[in-house]
Amino acid sequence: MELDRDSVHIRLLKVAGQVSAIDRMIAEGDSAERILVQINAAKSALHKVALFVTEDALSDLLGRDEGKSGDAAVVIERFSSLL
């Protein structure tokens, strides 16, 4: 699997927009509840980006020779270093 860089880029632009909106909400004195809702939405969106990148990295590791040879310990060790 290859990372869809355009899709990830678009998602990151949306996250940047959310963060900008949060900054504006704080500057305008919006309620903490509304600000926290938006912060959680931005965190969730960024987490989805991280999942795409992680999935791509794991797929890459499993596609290498050590993944094909069944040496799961090597793949797990390398994957763990990415976290």
Where are the model-predicted features located?
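Solvent-exposed interaction patches of small proteins and small membrane subunits
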Residues: 1-83
